Amino acid sequence: MSTVAKTNPKSSNKPGPVKSIIAGGVAGAIEISITYPAEFAKTRLQLYRNVEGTKAKLPPFGLEWYRGCSTVIVGNSLKAAVRFFAFDSIKKSLSDEHGHLTGPRTVLAGLGAGVAESVLVLTPFESIKTAIIDDRKRPNPRLKGFLQASRIIVHENGIRGLYRGLAATVARQAANSGVRFTAYNSIKQSLQSRLPPDEKLSTVTTFLVGSVAGIITVYCTQPIDTVKSRMQSLSASKEYKNSIHCAYKILTQDGLLRFWSGATPRLARLILSGGIVFTVYEKVMEILKPF
């Protein structure tokens, strides 16, 4: 009996896979519902091409900025669920007997989470979202929503149409998760070490730590994100042979700074995103802890 009493508290402190999936899914859905306009602006700016010196333009703020939102809400909740489940699973397998994770192993866990979410969830949903946003620039847009856009893309391009830009998406998410989780865990552990063992970081502090992790992530990974968006545009199959060819054309035709196009709205989103996702995730995990 005494053995059971000692081991149960320890095991209950470790997040199970179901709890990670639920907490990650809830966090992802709430985050994108709040930050989607910034995602729309980022994607539109990344899809802009230099044509006779014209400047990139965004439509007046309104419902137009929520085109493709339903697609991303579903995709983001699934993505976050897969990301946190994968990260927690990999982290658990790489941790020492005290549950501690070294810096390099944290990076490895983050990279693994990024690859998992890219292949299983993100690429198809990102392809549909980007196609819907890109389609809105046309005189007579065809794509109206997630299901209808999915049918058209699959009908015209096959299943491979949903996986356009897979390599760039995997690279971006691996880099995103590697940088983001490493920054978040490093800062969090540093701050937590200054507190008593039984005291947790406040909600405000957790939000700020997540926001800082988001800022670091944006500037490290924006070039890959721009290539990904271009590879998932409606004209990608006619313009680019692969992600490397796409990056070369952006560099030679639009210049080096074009790789950071859309960085400002993405930064705005990830500052909020990092704070919202990690804060909601931690809170949901606390709520689920007794179960």
From Swiss-Prot:
<feature type="transmembrane region" description="Helical; Name=3">
    <location>
        <begin position="108"/>
        <end position="128"/>
    </location>
</feature>
<keyword id="KW-0496">Mitochondrion</keyword>
<feature type="transmembrane region" description="Helical; Name=2">
    <location>
        <begin position="70"/>
        <end position="90"/>
    </location>
</feature>
<keyword id="KW-0812">Transmembrane</keyword>
<keyword id="KW-0677">Repeat</keyword>
<keyword id="KW-0472">Membrane</keyword>
<dbReference type="GO" id="GO:0005739">
    <property type="term" value="C:mitochondrion"/>
</dbReference>
<dbReference type="InterPro" id="IPR049563">
    <property type="entry name" value="TXTP-like"/>
</dbReference>
<dbReference type="GO" id="GO:0006843">
    <property type="term" value="P:mitochondrial citrate transmembrane transport"/>
</dbReference>
<keyword id="KW-0999">Mitochondrion inner membrane</keyword>
<feature type="transmembrane region" description="Helical; Name=5">
    <location>
        <begin position="201"/>
        <end position="221"/>
    </location>
</feature>
<feature type="repeat" description="Solcar 3">
    <location>
        <begin position="201"/>
        <end position="287"/>
    </location>
</feature>
<feature type="repeat" description="Solcar 1">
    <location>
        <begin position="15"/>
        <end position="93"/>
    </location>
</feature>
<dbReference type="InterPro" id="IPR002067">
    <property type="entry name" value="Mit_carrier"/>
</dbReference>
<feature type="transmembrane region" description="Helical; Name=6">
    <location>
        <begin position="259"/>
        <end position="280"/>
    </location>
</feature>
<keyword id="KW-0813">Transport</keyword>
<protein>
    <recommendedName>
        <fullName>Uncharacterized mitochondrial carrier C19G12.05</fullName>
    </recommendedName>
</protein>
<feature type="transmembrane region" description="Helical; Name=4">
    <location>
        <begin position="169"/>
        <end position="189"/>
    </location>
</feature>
<dbReference type="GO" id="GO:0005743">
    <property type="term" value="C:mitochondrial inner membrane"/>
</dbReference>
<dbReference type="InterPro" id="IPR023395">
    <property type="entry name" value="Mt_carrier_dom_sf"/>
</dbReference>
<dbReference type="GO" id="GO:0071913">
    <property type="term" value="F:citrate secondary active transmembrane transporter activity"/>
</dbReference>
<comment type="similarity">
    <text>Belongs to the mitochondrial carrier (TC 2.A.29) family.</text>
</comment>
<feature type="repeat" description="Solcar 2">
    <location>
        <begin position="104"/>
        <end position="190"/>
    </location>
</feature>
<keyword id="KW-1133">Transmembrane helix</keyword>
<feature type="transmembrane region" description="Helical; Name=1">
    <location>
        <begin position="21"/>
        <end position="41"/>
    </location>
</feature>
<dbReference type="InterPro" id="IPR018108">
    <property type="entry name" value="Mitochondrial_sb/sol_carrier"/>
</dbReference>
<dbReference type="Pfam" id="PF00153">
    <property type="entry name" value="Mito_carr"/>
</dbReference>
